[in-house]
Amino acid sequence: MPNDFIISQLPSNKILLEGKEYDFYSGTAYLGMNQDADFKRLLIEGMNCYGMSFGSSRNGNLQLDIYDQAEEKMAHWVGAEKALTVSSGMMAGQVVAQYLKTQNSTFFYAPSSHSANFHEPNVGLPNVSFEAWASNICEEISEKNAPHSVIVCNSCDAIKLSPYHFDWTSTLPQNQSITLIIDDSHGLGITGKNGSGILKQITVNENVRLIVVSSLHKAMGIAGGVVFADNDFIDKLRHTAFFASCSPIAPAYLYAYMHADAIYKKNQQKLKDNIQRFSSQLSDSQTLFNSIENYPVYYSLRDELYDFLFQKGIFIYSFAYPIKTGKPNTRIVLSSWHTSSQIDYLIDKVKEFCKVAEV
Protein backbone atom coordinates (compact mmCIF):
# COMPACT_ATOMS: atom_id res chain seq x y z
CA MET A 1 0.00 0.00 0.00
CA PRO A 2 1.43 3.43 -0.93
CA ASN A 3 1.93 5.70 2.04
CA ASP A 4 2.88 8.95 0.28
CA PHE A 5 0.06 11.44 -0.11
CA ILE A 6 -0.38 15.10 -1.00
CA ILE A 7 -3.08 17.15 0.71
CA SER A 8 -4.24 20.75 0.45
CA GLN A 9 -4.92 21.51 4.11
CA LEU A 10 -2.80 21.75 7.23
CA PRO A 11 -3.09 18.56 9.31
CA SER A 12 -4.80 18.70 12.67
CA ASN A 13 -6.27 15.77 14.61
CA LYS A 14 -7.88 14.70 11.34
CA ILE A 15 -6.93 14.83 7.67
CA LEU A 16 -8.87 14.28 4.46
CA LEU A 17 -7.37 11.82 1.96
CA GLU A 18 -9.13 11.10 -1.32
CA GLY A 19 -12.48 12.05 0.17
CA LYS A 20 -12.08 9.99 3.35
CA GLU A 21 -11.38 11.33 6.83
CA TYR A 22 -8.57 9.84 8.95
CA ASP A 23 -7.49 10.40 12.53
CA PHE A 24 -3.98 11.86 12.22
CA TYR A 25 -1.13 10.61 14.44
CA SER A 26 1.99 11.90 12.74
CA GLY A 27 4.03 15.09 12.48
CA THR A 28 5.69 17.02 15.29
CA ALA A 29 2.94 19.45 16.40
CA TYR A 30 3.00 17.91 19.88
CA LEU A 31 1.07 20.80 21.45
CA GLY A 32 -1.17 21.41 18.44
CA MET A 33 -0.19 25.08 18.39
CA ASN A 34 -0.43 25.49 14.62
CA GLN A 35 -4.16 24.74 14.82
CA ASP A 36 -4.90 26.33 18.19
CA ALA A 37 -7.61 28.98 17.69
CA ASP A 38 -6.39 31.18 20.56
CA PHE A 39 -2.80 31.09 19.29
CA LYS A 40 -4.01 31.98 15.80
CA ARG A 41 -5.75 35.05 17.20
CA LEU A 42 -2.54 36.14 18.90
CA LEU A 43 -0.65 35.59 15.66
CA ILE A 44 -3.10 37.84 13.81
CA GLU A 45 -2.69 40.49 16.51
CA GLY A 46 1.06 40.23 16.00
CA MET A 47 0.71 40.63 12.25
CA ASN A 48 -1.41 43.72 12.74
CA CYS A 49 1.32 45.16 14.95
CA TYR A 50 4.53 43.99 13.25
CA GLY A 51 3.47 42.95 9.76
CA MET A 52 3.77 39.52 8.15
CA SER A 53 7.59 39.39 8.03
CA PHE A 54 10.73 41.37 8.80
CA GLY A 55 13.35 40.75 6.14
CA SER A 56 16.01 42.99 7.62
CA SER A 57 19.22 42.13 9.44
CA ARG A 58 19.05 41.83 13.22
CA ASN A 59 22.24 43.90 13.23
CA GLY A 60 20.77 46.80 11.25
CA ASN A 61 20.37 50.34 12.54
CA LEU A 62 16.62 49.90 13.11
CA GLN A 63 15.51 47.05 15.36
CA LEU A 64 12.17 45.66 16.52
CA ASP A 65 11.76 45.40 20.29
CA ILE A 66 9.95 42.05 20.18
CA TYR A 67 13.13 40.04 19.47
CA ASP A 68 15.01 41.06 22.62
CA GLN A 69 11.83 40.72 24.68
CA ALA A 70 11.10 37.20 23.46
CA GLU A 71 14.72 36.07 23.78
CA GLU A 72 14.92 37.31 27.35
CA LYS A 73 11.73 35.43 28.21
CA MET A 74 12.92 32.21 26.52
CA ALA A 75 16.29 32.32 28.28
CA HIS A 76 14.66 32.76 31.68
CA TRP A 77 12.23 29.92 30.91
CA VAL A 78 14.87 27.31 30.05
CA GLY A 79 17.47 28.51 32.57
CA ALA A 80 20.05 29.92 30.15
CA GLU A 81 21.99 33.15 30.47
CA LYS A 82 20.93 34.24 27.02
CA ALA A 83 18.96 33.18 23.93
CA LEU A 84 19.25 34.03 20.26
CA THR A 85 16.40 33.35 17.84
CA VAL A 86 16.85 32.59 14.15
CA SER A 87 14.57 31.65 11.27
CA SER A 88 14.65 27.85 11.72
CA GLY A 89 16.03 24.98 13.74
CA MET A 90 18.43 24.24 10.89
CA MET A 91 19.71 27.82 11.08
CA ALA A 92 20.12 27.53 14.86
CA GLY A 93 22.36 24.53 14.40
CA GLN A 94 24.31 26.05 11.55
CA VAL A 95 24.99 29.45 13.10
CA VAL A 96 26.65 27.57 15.98
CA ALA A 97 28.43 24.91 13.92
CA GLN A 98 29.84 27.32 11.36
CA TYR A 99 31.18 29.63 14.05
CA LEU A 100 32.81 26.80 16.00
CA LYS A 101 34.30 25.47 12.76
CA THR A 102 36.46 28.61 12.67
CA GLN A 103 37.71 28.08 16.24
CA ASN A 104 40.22 25.25 15.66
CA SER A 105 37.60 22.75 16.83
CA THR A 106 37.50 18.96 16.63
CA PHE A 107 33.94 17.66 16.39
CA PHE A 108 32.63 14.50 18.06
CA TYR A 109 29.14 13.43 16.98
CA ALA A 110 26.83 11.10 18.84
CA PRO A 111 24.80 8.47 16.97
CA SER A 112 21.79 9.90 15.11
CA SER A 113 22.94 13.50 15.57
CA HIS A 114 20.76 15.78 13.46
CA SER A 115 22.28 17.14 10.25
CA ALA A 116 21.29 20.67 11.30
CA ASN A 117 24.35 20.58 13.55
CA PHE A 118 26.89 19.25 11.03
CA HIS A 119 29.93 21.47 10.48
CA GLU A 120 30.42 19.86 7.06
CA PRO A 121 27.82 18.77 4.46
CA ASN A 122 28.50 15.10 5.18
CA VAL A 123 29.53 13.76 8.57
CA GLY A 124 30.06 10.12 9.48
CA LEU A 125 28.07 9.16 12.57
CA PRO A 126 28.96 6.33 14.98
CA ASN A 127 27.11 3.11 14.22
CA VAL A 128 26.58 2.19 17.86
CA SER A 129 23.92 2.82 20.47
CA PHE A 130 23.86 6.14 22.30
CA GLU A 131 24.59 4.26 25.52
CA ALA A 132 27.71 2.65 24.03
CA TRP A 133 28.87 5.96 22.59
CA ALA A 134 28.30 7.80 25.88
CA SER A 135 30.29 5.20 27.81
CA ASN A 136 33.36 5.91 25.63
CA ILE A 137 33.16 9.61 24.78
CA CYS A 138 34.98 10.86 27.88
CA GLU A 139 37.94 8.57 27.21
CA GLU A 140 37.90 9.48 23.52
CA ILE A 141 38.00 13.20 24.30
CA SER A 142 40.79 12.67 26.82
CA GLU A 143 42.93 10.61 24.43
CA LYS A 144 42.42 12.98 21.49
CA ASN A 145 43.37 15.97 23.65
CA ALA A 146 42.35 18.42 20.93
CA PRO A 147 42.79 22.18 21.43
CA HIS A 148 39.00 22.50 21.46
CA SER A 149 36.60 19.55 21.46
CA VAL A 150 32.98 20.03 20.34
CA ILE A 151 30.52 17.28 21.29
CA VAL A 152 27.21 17.16 19.42
CA CYS A 153 24.16 15.09 20.36
CA ASN A 154 20.38 15.10 20.51
CA SER A 155 18.48 15.44 23.78
CA CYS A 156 16.43 12.33 23.04
CA ASP A 157 15.87 9.65 20.43
CA ALA A 158 12.62 10.96 18.94
CA ILE A 159 12.65 8.36 16.15
CA LYS A 160 13.18 4.96 17.79
CA LEU A 161 12.64 6.07 21.39
CA SER A 162 15.76 4.62 22.97
CA PRO A 163 16.36 6.34 26.33
CA TYR A 164 19.25 8.82 26.56
CA HIS A 165 21.07 9.37 29.85
CA PHE A 166 23.40 12.31 30.46
CA ASP A 167 25.30 11.44 33.63
CA TRP A 168 28.47 11.31 31.48
CA THR A 169 28.44 15.09 30.96
CA SER A 170 29.72 15.72 34.49
CA THR A 171 32.68 13.36 33.99
CA LEU A 172 34.19 14.97 30.89
CA PRO A 173 37.91 15.85 31.21
CA GLN A 174 38.42 18.98 33.30
CA ASN A 175 41.76 20.00 31.81
CA GLN A 176 40.54 20.63 28.25
CA SER A 177 38.46 23.20 26.39
CA ILE A 178 35.13 21.51 25.57
CA THR A 179 31.83 22.64 24.09
CA LEU A 180 28.75 20.45 24.42
CA ILE A 181 25.92 21.08 21.94
CA ILE A 182 22.57 19.42 22.61
CA ASP A 183 19.78 19.60 20.04
CA ASP A 184 16.51 19.79 21.99
CA SER A 185 14.16 20.19 19.03
CA HIS A 186 11.99 17.26 20.10
CA GLY A 187 12.04 18.11 23.80
CA LEU A 188 11.57 21.85 24.11
CA GLY A 189 7.99 22.60 25.04
CA ILE A 190 7.10 19.10 26.26
CA THR A 191 9.94 17.84 28.49
CA GLY A 192 11.41 19.31 31.66
CA LYS A 193 9.65 21.58 34.13
CA ASN A 194 6.95 23.60 32.37
CA GLY A 195 8.26 22.28 29.06
CA SER A 196 11.62 23.99 29.55
CA GLY A 197 13.51 21.10 27.99
CA ILE A 198 16.90 19.58 28.67
CA LEU A 199 19.16 22.45 29.76
CA LYS A 200 18.36 22.48 33.48
CA GLN A 201 18.90 18.72 33.60
CA ILE A 202 22.51 18.83 32.38
CA THR A 203 25.48 19.13 34.74
CA VAL A 204 28.87 20.17 33.36
CA ASN A 205 32.16 21.33 34.83
CA GLU A 206 33.40 24.92 34.47
CA ASN A 207 35.61 24.09 31.49
CA VAL A 208 32.64 22.82 29.47
CA ARG A 209 30.52 25.33 27.58
CA LEU A 210 26.93 24.09 27.32
CA ILE A 211 24.88 25.12 24.28
CA VAL A 212 21.33 24.03 23.53
CA VAL A 213 19.92 24.52 20.04
CA SER A 214 16.34 23.84 19.07
CA SER A 215 13.67 24.19 16.48
CA LEU A 216 10.72 26.23 17.74
CA HIS A 217 8.48 24.91 15.00
CA LYS A 218 7.56 21.62 16.65
CA ALA A 219 5.95 21.74 20.09
CA MET A 220 6.12 25.54 20.30
CA GLY A 221 4.40 26.23 16.98
CA ILE A 222 6.78 29.09 16.12
CA ALA A 223 8.36 29.18 12.66
CA GLY A 224 11.94 29.59 13.83
CA GLY A 225 14.80 28.26 15.91
CA VAL A 226 16.78 29.27 18.98
CA VAL A 227 20.24 29.00 20.54
CA PHE A 228 20.66 28.98 24.33
CA ALA A 229 24.11 29.64 25.79
CA ASP A 230 26.15 31.95 28.01
CA ASN A 231 26.24 35.70 27.39
CA ASP A 232 29.70 35.70 25.85
CA PHE A 233 28.94 33.01 23.28
CA ILE A 234 25.62 34.54 22.20
CA ASP A 235 27.30 37.93 21.79
CA LYS A 236 29.91 36.31 19.56
CA LEU A 237 27.20 34.72 17.40
CA ARG A 238 25.36 38.06 17.15
CA HIS A 239 28.42 39.60 15.50
CA THR A 240 29.12 36.89 12.93
CA ALA A 241 28.46 37.59 9.26
CA PHE A 242 26.44 34.36 9.19
CA PHE A 243 23.92 35.70 11.71
CA ALA A 244 23.93 39.27 10.39
CA SER A 245 23.02 38.10 6.88
CA CYS A 246 20.07 35.94 8.01
CA SER A 247 16.49 37.18 8.05
CA PRO A 248 14.90 36.56 11.47
CA ILE A 249 11.70 34.87 12.64
CA ALA A 250 8.58 36.70 11.52
CA PRO A 251 8.00 38.99 14.54
CA ALA A 252 4.29 38.16 14.75
CA TYR A 253 5.19 34.68 16.01
CA LEU A 254 7.23 36.14 18.86
CA TYR A 255 4.39 38.51 19.72
CA ALA A 256 2.09 35.49 19.97
CA TYR A 257 4.67 33.64 22.10
CA MET A 258 4.92 36.57 24.51
CA HIS A 259 1.17 36.40 25.21
CA ALA A 260 0.58 32.63 25.04
CA ASP A 261 1.58 31.35 28.49
CA ALA A 262 -1.92 30.16 29.34
CA ILE A 263 -2.30 28.49 25.94
CA TYR A 264 0.96 26.55 26.29
CA LYS A 265 0.05 25.50 29.81
CA LYS A 266 -3.40 24.30 28.70
CA ASN A 267 -2.02 22.31 25.78
CA GLN A 268 0.83 20.82 27.80
CA GLN A 269 -1.69 19.49 30.31
CA LYS A 270 -3.91 18.13 27.54
CA LEU A 271 -0.93 16.33 26.01
CA LYS A 272 -0.01 14.83 29.39
CA ASP A 273 -3.60 13.63 29.76
CA ASN A 274 -3.53 12.04 26.30
CA ILE A 275 -0.22 10.30 26.99
CA GLN A 276 -1.56 8.95 30.26
CA ARG A 277 -4.81 7.81 28.64
CA PHE A 278 -2.98 5.99 25.85
CA SER A 279 -0.16 4.47 27.92
CA SER A 280 -2.41 3.30 30.75
CA GLN A 281 -4.55 1.27 28.36
CA LEU A 282 -1.71 -0.41 26.45
CA SER A 283 -1.28 -3.22 29.01
CA ASP A 284 -0.49 -6.35 26.98
CA SER A 285 0.21 -4.24 23.88
CA GLN A 286 3.27 -2.62 25.51
CA THR A 287 5.66 -4.97 23.69
CA LEU A 288 4.52 -3.51 20.37
CA PHE A 289 6.22 -0.18 21.09
CA ASN A 290 9.40 1.46 22.23
CA SER A 291 8.47 4.50 24.27
CA ILE A 292 9.83 6.99 26.78
CA GLU A 293 7.88 7.80 29.92
CA ASN A 294 5.70 10.90 29.53
CA TYR A 295 6.76 11.34 25.89
CA PRO A 296 4.13 11.45 23.10
CA VAL A 297 5.80 9.17 20.54
CA TYR A 298 5.56 5.37 20.25
CA TYR A 299 7.88 3.51 17.88
CA SER A 300 7.13 0.05 16.51
CA LEU A 301 9.27 -2.44 14.61
CA ARG A 302 6.07 -3.86 13.15
CA ASP A 303 5.76 -1.77 9.99
CA GLU A 304 2.56 -3.58 9.03
CA LEU A 305 0.88 -1.61 11.82
CA TYR A 306 0.68 1.32 9.41
CA ASP A 307 -1.38 -0.58 6.82
CA PHE A 308 -3.64 -2.08 9.47
CA LEU A 309 -4.45 1.25 11.12
CA PHE A 310 -4.84 2.97 7.75
CA GLN A 311 -7.61 0.52 6.88
CA LYS A 312 -9.29 1.51 10.17
CA GLY A 313 -9.22 5.22 9.36
CA ILE A 314 -6.06 6.04 11.32
CA PHE A 315 -3.04 7.66 9.66
CA ILE A 316 0.28 7.24 11.49
CA TYR A 317 3.91 8.12 10.78
CA SER A 318 5.64 5.59 8.52
CA PHE A 319 8.52 6.70 6.32
CA ALA A 320 12.29 6.47 6.18
CA TYR A 321 14.13 9.40 7.78
CA PRO A 322 16.43 11.14 7.20
CA ILE A 323 17.29 9.12 4.06
CA LYS A 324 14.24 8.21 1.98
CA THR A 325 15.65 4.87 0.83
CA GLY A 326 16.04 3.48 4.34
CA LYS A 327 13.69 1.32 6.39
CA PRO A 328 10.42 3.04 7.37
CA ASN A 329 10.15 4.31 10.91
CA THR A 330 6.67 3.38 12.09
CA ARG A 331 5.47 5.59 14.93
CA ILE A 332 2.34 6.88 16.61
CA VAL A 333 2.60 10.55 17.55
CA LEU A 334 0.14 11.94 20.08
CA SER A 335 -0.79 15.61 20.26
CA SER A 336 -2.81 17.83 22.55
CA TRP A 337 -5.35 18.19 19.76
CA HIS A 338 -6.51 14.56 19.99
CA THR A 339 -9.80 13.98 21.76
CA SER A 340 -10.40 11.32 24.40
CA SER A 341 -12.64 9.40 22.02
CA GLN A 342 -9.90 9.40 19.38
CA ILE A 343 -7.38 8.02 21.88
CA ASP A 344 -9.83 5.31 22.94
CA TYR A 345 -10.48 4.35 19.31
CA LEU A 346 -6.75 4.21 18.63
CA ILE A 347 -6.19 1.96 21.64
CA ASP A 348 -8.99 -0.33 20.50
CA LYS A 349 -7.46 -0.73 17.04
CA VAL A 350 -3.94 -1.22 18.41
CA LYS A 351 -5.24 -4.03 20.61
CA GLU A 352 -7.04 -5.50 17.62
CA PHE A 353 -3.79 -5.45 15.64
CA CYS A 354 -1.97 -7.22 18.48
CA LYS A 355 -4.50 -10.05 18.38
CA VAL A 356 -4.36 -10.41 14.61
CA ALA A 357 -0.56 -10.16 14.46
CA GLU A 358 -0.11 -12.29 17.59
CA VAL A 359 2.04 -9.67 19.27
Model-derived features with residue positions:
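Active-site phosphate-binding strand-loop segment of PLP-dependent enzymes
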Residues: 130-182
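Structural motif of enzymes handling amino- and sulfur-group chemistry
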Residues: 232-233, 247-270, 274-279, 283
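Conserved N-terminal alpha-helix of the aminotransferase class I/II PLP-enzyme fold
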Residues: 40-88
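Conserved PLP-anchoring active-site segment centered on the Schiff-base-forming lysine
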Residues: 96-117, 134, 138-140, 271
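N-terminal "arm"/small-domain region of PLP-dependent enzymes with the aminotransferase-like
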Residues: 1-53
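Active-site PLP attachment segment
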Residues: 190, 202-236
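Conserved PLP-binding active-site segment of the aspartate aminotransferase-like
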Residues: 296-301, 314-352
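Conserved PLP-binding catalytic core of the aspartate aminotransferase-like
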Residues: 272-313, 336
